[in-house]
């Protein structure tokens, strides 16, 4: 149990997808204007990462890995296309669910919901799972932890962005300029966790 807790904490704080690896920055910067929208997208990323990482772990272990299907047959060259297909299918299911049951969040996310399919944080989570050779329970914990870390970062940035609306930001830094500086300072803050050994 201790191993899974340390893996979760490590994936949320030490190896944060957005602030340590800078993955998923397109939606991270675009949807960080309001806390409510950022929170909704963060939940969607947790769901997609929490399901796609373990599902892709099963697909990789039982089908794509060298000798998994048939002895001597290596299908690992199909990793990228298979992983993207699984992620796209999960995002489509999530999109239909939100459209049916939470239409306000579906409208608020707009074009960024389908963009989760090509969000490099999602694919990065799956790639790290393969690279680090996580088993199924580890991939579940890692997927949920990585999604939680990404959500924590985007909600924090959205909160800071909402506060900066009332600040006297110099004209040359308004918009993306101050956002990049803020993200850089947040990344420096999260870098302080890198010395922790779990």
UniProtKB/Swiss-Prot annotation:
It comes from the Bacteria. The keyword Cytoplasm does not apply. It is an enzyme of class 7 (translocase). It is found in: Cell inner membrane. Keywords: Cell inner membrane, Cell membrane, Ion transport, Membrane, NAD, Sodium, Sodium transport, Translocase, Transmembrane, Transmembrane helix, Transport, Ubiquinone. It holds the Pfam family Rnf-Nqr. GO terms for cellular component: Gram-negative-bacterium-type cell wall; plasma membrane. The chain crosses the membrane at residues 11-31, 35-55, 77-97, 110-130, 140-160, 176-196. It catalyses: a ubiquinone + n Na(+)(in) + NADH + H(+) = a ubiquinol + n Na(+)(out) + NAD(+). GO terms for molecular function: oxidoreductase activity, acting on NAD(P)H, quinone or similar compound as acceptor. Its main location: membrane. NQR complex catalyzes the reduction of ubiquinone-1 to ubiquinol by two successive reactions, coupled with the transport of Na(+) ions from the cytoplasm to the periplasm. NqrA to NqrE are probably involved in the second step, the conversion of ubisemiquinone to ubiquinol. Composed of six subunits; NqrA, NqrB, NqrC, NqrD, NqrE and NqrF. This is Na(+)-translocating NADH-quinone reductase subunit E. It comes from Mannheimia succiniciproducens (strain KCTC 0769BP / MBEL55E). The gene is nqrE.
